[in-house]
């Protein structure tokens, strides 16, 4: 239906942005903030009528500049890619938690149907933050294969071999998924209000240091 009563706001006191609008007689609000304590972006979508939130969420990059989209369970998708030869691998995950209704993963989408409220959690990571751990994993993999001719080729190519690159990419994705899942589990283990309160408290320790007027 048509959208009306559309408003956008940025609250500098809380470091949160929100949007409100009406559609088909239902009033919706969407609030988003980047939480340093939770290490993730949190988005809350609410309405004033039960069971009226239906949405599809996905990641996109220009010209499909990513390697693929995986799933973690039925409520989380992970977009992943790399920056080319000798570059870092990256991944970003999206988790949906719905009060009422249902959440399912269809292809590259998370689909929420008939919810009262939806909280989305966005977490990103790259192998720059876990270089040593990835190197250790690859060293162990090569050690396991060192007796084979293929392993010898991998070592001699020092990362230029296609098989090595594939193996390293798979290891990087596994590592990044695990790191992001820990962050998502911690965030989802708290209520939305707890996450918001912790975010505001952390932010105001910096924001409230200075007060000036013009």
PLM region spans:
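Aromatic-residue-lined binding/catalytic grooves and analogous aromatic/hydrophobic interfacial grooves
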Residues: 1-214
């Amino acid at each position: 239906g048509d959208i009306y009563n559309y408003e956008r706001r940025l609250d500098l006191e809380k470091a949160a942005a929100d949007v409100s609008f009406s559609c088909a007689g239902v009033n919706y609000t969407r609030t988003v903030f980047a939480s340093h304590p939770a290490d993730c972006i949190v988005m809350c979508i609410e309405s004033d009528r039960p069971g009226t939130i239906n949405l599809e969420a996905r990641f996109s990059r220009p010209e499909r500049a990513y390697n693929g989209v995986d799933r973690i369970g039925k409520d989380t998708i992970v977009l992943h890619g790399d920056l080319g030869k000798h570059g870092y691998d990256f991944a970003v995950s999206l988790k949906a938690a719905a009060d009422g209704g249902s959440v399912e993963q269809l292809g590259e989408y998370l689909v929420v149907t008939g919810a009262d409220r939806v909280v989305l959690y966005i977490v990103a990571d790259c192998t720059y933050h876990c270089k040593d751990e990835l190197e250790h994993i690859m060293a162990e993999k090569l050690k396991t294969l060192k007796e084979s001719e293929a392993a010898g080729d991998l070592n001699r190519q020092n990362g230029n071999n296609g098989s090595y690159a594939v193996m390293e990419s798979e290891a990087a994705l596994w590592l990044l998924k695990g790191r992001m899942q820990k962050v998502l589990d911690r965030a989802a283990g708290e209520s939305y209000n707890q996450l918001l309160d912790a975010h505001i408290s952390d932010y105001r320790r910096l924001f409230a240091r200075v007060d000036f007027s013009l």
